[in-house]
Swiss-Prot record:
EC assignment: 2.8.1.4
Protein name (record): Probable tRNA sulfurtransferase
Species of provenance: Treponema pallidum (strain Nichols)
Record keywords: ATP-binding, Cytoplasm, Nucleotide-binding, RNA-binding, Thiamine biosynthesis, Transferase, tRNA-binding
Reactions it catalyzes: [ThiI sulfur-carrier protein]-S-sulfanyl-L-cysteine + a uridine in tRNA + 2 reduced [2Fe-2S]-[ferredoxin] + ATP + H(+) = [ThiI sulfur-carrier protein]-L-cysteine + a 4-thiouridine in tRNA + 2 oxidized [2Fe-2S]-[ferredoxin] + AMP + diphosphate; [ThiS sulfur-carrier protein]-C-terminal Gly-Gly-AMP + S-sulfanyl-L-cysteinyl-[cysteine desulfurase] + AH2 = [ThiS sulfur-carrier protein]-C-terminal-Gly-aminoethanethioate + L-cysteinyl-[cysteine desulfurase] + A + AMP + 2 H(+)
A GO cellular component annotation in the UniProt record: cytosol
Family, per entry: Belongs to the ThiI family.
Keyword tRNA-binding: yes
Domain of life per record: Bacteria
UniProt subcellular location: Cytoplasm
Example of a GO MF term: tRNA-uracil-4 sulfurtransferase activity
Residues bound to ATP: 186-187, 211-212, 268, 290, 299
Pathway: Cofactor biosynthesis; thiamine diphosphate biosynthesis
Length: 401
């Protein structure tokens, strides 16, 4: 704690490799964390592969900062750190204080890991570790164990000062949200689409969400589930816009006039056409879906080819080759799985045929679609859409979830 504030040090991830765009990525990372923590007036700086964060020294500010760091894309790890002057005396004093605190918490052994980023410093990394470790060992606070220590004390000698920290928490890696443009996620209430959205967020893309419902055939709880999923994604992406479109009249028309095996695929074709209009309105440059090849009948190669032909925008399918167990594991890690398994149907499961078409031809499906004269219904669905802006929330109020 320095000057009444709490310091955090984070290791910047993949963006440090992008030399041509490095400063742009650093600025975006600074901006993202500053926006996440705007309620507590943080000081954020990124330089030389490290993110430096200073927040007020209060429980609420520290809780908010640590929760935001746990959702921040673009860092590989972070820790609460102690800043001190770049002298061996100051570094040793701070390290001894860390060791004493660890001993009070019941720790018995330690190891020093030192890194000298400033090559002008008077000691090498190994010399720093050796000298500081010797002082702690001789003081009797902790015993040395280089292989299986109870605590590791990290020392980093940076350009302007030194930082010491103990437990380092794992970051989410990836790229800062916002450096890769904007996409529109077709968000259902299932397990897959939220994971697909997270995958694109982790590649630096800002995502907005589109949900299709068929009220009263789908219950209000189904939409509430999707709203909760969008709130989770907004924590990783800072914010999102959720657009809700009713497909009730379109599904009635399909149920009455379309060939039964083609029902689901024709509905997907309608979704893609509406999604393109929503995407262009929101300046999204691509559509994102949770489709995984051959996972269900509507996701055969031929069916995906048909739906891709319904839009001029690229369709990103980040889960196309993913294993279902891997998808579930990711959903659990990011906090969407428990929401996704709530037992409420979405519009895609309504009126689903027992024997859906598996190997359609694009031309044949386009003929079927055109014969149904769905244009006015699609226009009505788009015209009556509803939008909600959702912001990521961080802090003490979130801790009970």
């Amino acid at each position: 704690m320095v000057n009444g504030s709490t310091q955090y040090l984070a290791h910047v991830g993949e963006l440090s490799l992008k030399k041509g765009n490095r400063r742009q990525f650093e600025v975006q990372l600074e901006r993202n964390l500053t926006l996440m923590l705007r309620s507590i007036n943080p000081h954020v700086t990124v330089r030389a592969g490290r993110l430096y964060l200073s927040v007020p020294a209060s429980f609420e500010a520290q809780t908010t900062a640590e929760q935001a760091l746990s959702y921040l894309l673009g860092i590989t790890g972070w820790a609460a750190a102690t800043a001190c002057p770049k002298t061996m005396e100051a570094i040793t004093r701070c390290a001894h204080a860390e060791a004493t605190l660890a001993a009070r918490e019941g720790k018995r052994t330690f190891r020093i890991e030192a890194r000298r980023a400033d090559k002008r410093f008077c000691r090498t990394s190994s010399e720093i570790a050796r000298e500081v470790g010797a002082v702690i060992h001789q003081s009797g606070a902790l015993s040395v164990d280089l292989h299986h220590p109870d605590v590791v004390i990290f020392i980093e000698v940076r350009e302007r000062e030194a930082f010491l920290y103990g437990a380092r928490r794992r970051g989410l890696r990836g790229l800062p949200c916002g450096v890769s443009g904007r996409g529109l996620l077709l968000l259902s209430g299932g397990i897959d689409s939220p994971v697909a959205g997270y995958r694109m967020l982790s590649r630096g893309m800002h995502i907005d969400c589109l949900y299709f419902h068929s009220y009263p055939y789908t219950p209000p709880e189904a939409q509430k589930k999707v709203e909760d999923l969008a709130k989770v994604l907004a924590r990783y992406g800072l914010s999102t816009t959720l657009t809700v479109v009713s497909l009730t009249d379109i599904q009635k028309q399909l149920q009455t006039h379309a060939p039964a095996p083609s029902l689901t695929l024709l509905l997907r074709m309608c979704m893609m056409r509406i999604a393109e209009h929503v995407a262009r309105e929101q300046r999204a440059r691509c559509l994102i879906t949770g489709e995984s090849l051959a996972q269900v009948a509507s996701q055969t190669l031929e069916n995906l080819t048909v739906t891709s032909a319904c839009t001029h925008l690229p369709i990103f399918r980040p889960l196309i080759g993913a294993d279902k167990e891997d998808i579930i594991r990711t959903a659990t890690e990011i906090g969407t799985y428990a929401i996704s398994i709530r037992p409420y149907e979405d519009c895609c499961t309504l009126f689903a045929p027992k024997h859906p078409v598996l190997r359609p031809e694009v031309e044949e499906m386009q003929k079927q679609y055109q014969s149904l004269m769905l244009g006015p219904l699609l226009e009505d669905a788009f015209r009556t859409r509803k939008r909600t802006r959702i912001y990521g929330n961080y802090g003490v109020q979130e801790s009970g979830e």
